[in-house]
Structures are given as C-alpha cells and as structure tokens.
C-alpha cells in the first residue's frame, strides 16, 4: 500500500514513506499518476557524512536520479542549523541547482533535548534571512519556501522571509514539531499584500 496525498493538482509521495527509490519503483509511481517525489538532500554534500549514518549521499542521488528518469518532478531541500558553515549552505544551493530542483523546502533545526543535535547553536534570524537571499540568487526560478522551525528560529522576522527571496511557506504542523495557527500565517501573508494560492510542492 502506498501512502500519498493530493496537493493542488499533484499527487505527492514523501520519502519518509518510501525511502530510497529504485528505478522500477519510480516508474511504477509514475504509472499510477504520481507527478512529484519528495527527497531532501538535507545539507551540503561535504557535510552529509557528519549528520547521517543510516545511508549515504549517493543513496540520495540514486533516489533523485531514479525519480527524474521516470519523469517525476523532485521536491528537495534541507535543514539549516546542523552545524554547517555558511560556505556549505552555498554549496547546498548550488547542488540543488545542479540537480535541476525547482521546489525547495528549507527547514530550520529546532534543537530537541535527547536528540543528537540537542546542543546545536541555532542560527540568528538575520543569518537565516541572508541564507534565504543567497538561495534565491542561486535558484532564481525555484519555488523556495520556509518550512519547519521557522516559528522558533525566525520569531518576529518570519514575514521578512517572504520579502527577502522566498516565495512559499509551509503551514501547519511538521514532522517533529508543531507550527503556529493557519489563521496567523494567512494574516501574515495578507499583511504583506500577498494572496494565498493553491498549495504547490
């Protein structure tokens, strides 16, 4: 059984459900009507071995290439705050550009007690906004959205993300943390003079 959801006009499969994707699996998904596959690269290739021990960066590339071979559009981004350097954030952006990714969720680590990254130093709101702006310069045509952790890390500067390079926002709850109310986010978007559109990935 495949867990999937309809988002806008696209059926989306998330990699937390399917993990590493073979070429045959990718073509099966395409055959049943899936149009987009989600698989974050998480961080820069040079930093990946420092944050993940269950699979390799090449496993990520294997999955993304197979999805693309089958004609699936790939949604891929990562997390800021994994003790990466500013240079590695730029490296990550160029890697997404190289892969031809047009849908980029950018999460912000929320350190949680008892986890391996509990003691990580969080980025300041201005560091995050600078990183967002850099991603926009490197990926000028991509849908780049702020996602998990924005409430905790950006705090009162959340709205500036949408005026500083990003053109999307993920609302509601996330994988491990809750978000703020949908009504509050809609009001923020309205206050910026923007409109809420059909959700896309």
Outline where the language-model segments fall.
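Structural preference for beta-strand elements that scaffold enzyme active sites
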Residues: 15, 36-38, 73-75, 103, ...
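Acidic (Asp/Glu)-rich catalytic clusters
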Residues: 30-33, 65, 69, 97-98
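Catalytic cores of alpha/beta
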Residues: 22-29, 83-95, 152-163
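Auxiliary Fe-S-binding modules of radical SAM enzymes
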Residues: 10, 97-201
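Alpha-helix N-cap and loop-to-helix initiation/capping positions
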Residues: 52-59, 84-91, 119-127
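Single conserved hydrophobic/aromatic residue that forms the stacking wall/gate
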Residues: 1-13
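Oxyanion-binding "anion nests"
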Residues: 75-81, 89-110
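Conserved radical SAM core fold
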Residues: 21-26, 35-57, 73-75, 79-83, ...
């Amino acid at each position: 059984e495949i867990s999937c959801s309809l988002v806008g006009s696209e059926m989306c499969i998330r990699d937390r459900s399917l993990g590493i994707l073979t070429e045959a699996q990718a073509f099966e998904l395409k055959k049943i009507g899936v149009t987009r596959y989600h698989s974050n690269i998480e961080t820069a290739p040079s930093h990946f071995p420092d944050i993940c021990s269950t699979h390799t960066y090449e496993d990520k590339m294997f999955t993304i290439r197979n999805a693309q071979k089958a004609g699936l559009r790939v949604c891929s981004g990562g997390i800021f705050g994994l003790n990466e350097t500013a240079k590695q954030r730029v490296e990550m952006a160029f890697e997404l550009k190289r892969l031809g990714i047009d849908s980029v969720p950018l999460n912000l680590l929320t350190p949680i007690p008892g986890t391996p990254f509990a003691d990580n130093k969080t980025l300041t709101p201005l560091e995050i906004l600078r990183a967002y702006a850099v991603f926009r310069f490197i990926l000028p045509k991509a849908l780049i959205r702020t996602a998990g952790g924005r409430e905790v890390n950006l705090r009162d500067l959340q709205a500036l993300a949408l005026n500083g390079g990003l053109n999307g926002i993920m609302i509601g709850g996330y994988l491990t943390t809750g978000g703020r109310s949908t009504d509050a986010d809609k009001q923020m978007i309205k206050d910026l003079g923007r409109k809420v559109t059909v959700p896309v990935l």
